[in-house]
Amino acid sequence: ELGAGVEDHSILLREPLQRVARSVYPIMGVVYDGDRASDTGAQIKNFHHDIKGVDGQGRRYHALNPETFYWAHATFFMLIIKTAEYFCGGLTEAEKHQLFDEHVQWYRMYGMSMRPVPKSWEEFCDYWDRVCRDDLELTPAARDILYMRIPKPRFVLMPTFAWDQLFKPLVGAQRWIAA
């Protein structure tokens, strides 16, 4: 479902930097906006209201399907875990449990059903492994993201070939973390 929504509705593949820049602020707002965090979460949820359709295999999808919305959230959570693992020496089991509990509080701010949310860090690990093993599909959107290039902004005064060479390691690192 997530791949179909990205393919049909997102500008991520056309304007990756702009899409990320527009998303980071509100997503971080759900974590750091204090008393306004639940309002920010509701705003993000509203952004997804009209993201629906039928995928290439004839299956209906909607971004507000609780399983789909939680999976997207779970990928942000695992990005934090993997970034700490790859670049900061990892987290202790106690820190992973704490971060899991915090990610549940973060997710609650969206006002979505809590049904798909695992009850513990251990259940989350089982959930993550199961979804990665049994549910993920190599959709056209996922394939496009694998080969995405970050276009050079007009104001950058360097040749395009140099820009592309500069960002190849960055895009490669992004894929490595996501894997």
Protein language model regions, located:
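Mature, function-bearing regions of proteins
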Residues: 1-179
